[in-house]
């Protein structure tokens, strides 16, 4: 990720945007490898659309600040092979968790409408994660220390 700004708000927004780019890729991979009409493919298509919309909101928000939004990478490496619906669900949970952490960072760094955007995206990530089988947590996007 290349960001020209050293503003913490912009850096958090750019990191969240980079995460959304990766999420769009991951959900395209999940949907492309699943059985047409299956619940996994249907959920993946819904999540794909949601992350594209989130990505587009972040692009507009960053551009409105006069910054160049980070572009998508030419490709992404999946963390493991997508062999079956169990692996697809595991990847989806990982995507939502990682994006949730990035949006929580926006909530922490930003204010006003940008903070509200981060909070909205964080909630959506948490809800999608639960749809994919993740446990509900008291503070989504915040890693609990034990």
Where are these regions (language model features)?
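All-alpha RGS (Regulator of G-protein Signaling) helical domain and cognate RGS-like helical scaffolds
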Residues: 1-146
């Amino acid at each position: 990720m290349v960001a020209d700004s050293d503003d913490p708000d912009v850096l958090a927004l750019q990191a969240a945007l980079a995460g959304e780019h990766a999420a769009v890729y991951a959900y395209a991979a999940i949907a492309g490898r699943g059985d047409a009409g299956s619940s996994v493919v249907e959920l993946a298509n819904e999540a794909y659309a949601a992350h594209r919309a989130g990505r587009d909101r972040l692009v507009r928000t960053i551009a409105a600040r006069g910054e160049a939004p980070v572009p998508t990478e030419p490709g992404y490496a999946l963390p493991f092979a997508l062999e079956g619906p169990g692996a697809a669900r595991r990847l989806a949970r990982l995507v939502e968790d990682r994006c949730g952490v990035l949006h929580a960072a926006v909530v922490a760094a930003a204010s006003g409408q940008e903070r509200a955007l981060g909070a909205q995206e964080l909630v959506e990530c948490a809800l999608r994660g639960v749809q994919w089988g993740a446990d509900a947590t008291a503070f989504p996007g915040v890693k609990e220390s034990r």
